[in-house]
Curated annotation (Swiss-Prot):
The keyword Ribosomal protein applies. This is Large ribosomal subunit protein uL2. GO terms for biological process: cytoplasmic translation. It comes from Leptothrix cholodnii (strain ATCC 51168 / LMG 8142 / SP-6) (Leptothrix discophora (strain SP-6)). One of its GO terms (molecular function) is rRNA binding. Belongs to the universal ribosomal protein uL2 family. The lineage of its organism: Bacteria, Pseudomonadati, Pseudomonadota, Betaproteobacteria, Burkholderiales.
Length: 274
């Protein structure tokens, strides 16, 4: 990977920083692992906006990624590393010894031609997936399950990872990048290593149109709206918020905690750092 600063030949290119990935596959993705993806522009089945600032963007297919990694004992060869428009991380196309192909989240350092393995007997090597009970304490892992057999949910985006801190009984403690320490069942699976594309956060888009290609629409400030549209709206001329910052639905924002999942509260050993 290389970080390239583009020459300022136009206002839209001034300040653009690109991440060049010469190792990525330049052809088409595996057709058998593609699914159509309908664009909903942030609307639900009633047509109501459920996620703001979404719409447009380039059309693309969904790549079916294997987050369970439950095909044990069969070695798989990495055929290539690909770009995935649906996520920040890169994906790897692997082919098992029995001929089955699948996509996995590519860990940092994984290259075409290498071999990955799933199961309790897999060696501790980047890209291999094991139950947490078989992973040494102190290891850096990613694609961690929260429930056995449910599939990876933690540390799936570019450059992320968690650290296995300890094991006590049927639970292990992992420390997330946010600083949160969480209990996870030792039968949950995790993949060794760190997620690829760790320089993703260094990219600078340079112009609004580059974000529109991704399906991201403009974000309008509340103080620039009318009172009917936002609690911060209204006033003569330029005015401030006039109150504690709130969301469009009058919920306190900028630091106010909204987590209300009491069912899994016991699995959090230490809350994340602010």
């Amino acid at each position: 990977m290389a970080v390239v600063k583009v020459k300022p030949t136009s206002p839209g290119r001034r300040g653009v920083v690109k991440i060049v990935h010469k190792h990525l596959h330049k052809g088409k993705p595996e057709a058998s692992l593609l699914e159509p993806q309908m664009q909903n522009a942030g609307r639900n089945n009633n047509g109501h906006i459920t996620v703001r600032h979404k719409g447009g963007g380039h059309k693309h297919h969904y790549r079916v990624v294997d987050f369970r990694r439950n095909k044990d004992g069969i070695p798989a060869k990495v055929e290539r590393i690909e770009y995935d428009p649906n996520r920040t991380a890169h994906i790897a196309l692997i082919c098992y010894a029995d001929g089955e192909r699948s996509y996995i989240i590519a860990p940092r350092g994984l290259e075409a031609g290498q071999t990955v393995l799933n199961g309790a007997e897999a060696p501790i090597k980047a890209g291999n997936t094991l139950p947490i009970r078989n992973i040494p304490v102190g290891s850096t892992i990613h694609c961690v399950e929260m429930m056995p057999g449910k599939g990876a949910q933690i540390a799936r985006s570019a450059g992320t990872s968690v650290t296995l801190m300890a094991r006590e009984g049927i639970y292990a403690q992992v420390r997330l990048r946010s600083g949160e320490v969480r209990k996870i069942h030792i039968d949950c699976r995790a993949t060794i290593g760190e997620v690829s594309n760790e320089e993703h956060n260094l990219r600078q888009y340079g112009k609004a149109g580059a974000k529109r290609w991704l399906g991201i629409r403009p974000t309008v400030r509340g103080v620039a709206m009318n009172p009917v549209d936002h609690p911060h709206g209204g006033g003569e001329g330029r005015t401030g918020e006039g109150q504690a910052p709130v969301s469009p639905w009058n919920t306190l924002t900028k630091g106010y905690r909204t987590r209300n999942n009491k069912r899994t509260q016991t699995f959090i050993v230490s809350r994340r750092k602010k």
